Amino acid sequence: MKKKKFNVYPYLLVAPAMLIIMCVVFIPVVNAIGMSFQSYDLRRPKDIAFVALANYIEVFQDALFWQSLWKTILWVVFGVGLQFVFGFVLALLLNKSFKGRGIVRAVSLIPWVTPGVLIGLMWRWMYDGNYGVFNDIFKKLHLITDNIPFLSQTNTAFPAVIATIVWQGIPFFALMILAGLQGIPGELYEAADIDGATGIQKLFRITIPSIKNTIMITALLRVIWVANSVDVIFNMTEGGPAYSTQTLSVYIFNKANTLDMGYASAMAIILALVLCTVAIPYLIFTFKEEDN
């Protein structure tokens, strides 16, 4: 049998992208892993030395680390969960035919394409306890009598930043789910109508099963992105007040700003491992489904 000639052309096409990925992802990750095993404080460059697992031990003994990790879990669960619910509803609405649907679709993408830094600043002004628009609206609706310093109180700051990240992420869920909805054959719904299926039955028997993979990959991406998000929280509260909005990624960023790169790198590696525990089971499940 004649051997198939090795074709180098596809590898040449992929090589530039792989080189870029190696430069901007692989090398920094390896560097971060190396720093996590060192006492790497840029304020004391002469004291940089290998300390083995000392940074990791210190991290696990840090009460603020565990508080930030718990805040990260709440941040992801409520942030991504609400994004999915509202995004799913928006996708169902945009999948209907109505006048001006194209304009509504375009406008609905504005939160997603707006930079996170700008979103953080914009919502911080809206939440402002002195001249924020939310206080003005609530007063006109006679819901409050005195201004509420939303971002200065520990009991309101965290819900406020969650509302912001939900607003930002709804369009992404809506866009991805809408693409999945448009790929569902109309014959399935026609057959369901003939069988007398209700709207709820069609939703749970046809719609959701048909876009299950789309929902899962979209949710996975958002979990990773939201868990790693720094810009929105940092520009709104910087993790305060009293660390009430400090997620692990914000804690890492704040720690890196103190130039303690070894400690910050150790926390970053731990966060990456935590996210891997979410991503790997999904990938295994996906590969098993493809094999079946």
Give a label for each model feature.
Residues 2-292:
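A structural signal for multi-pass alpha-helical bundles of membrane permease subunits
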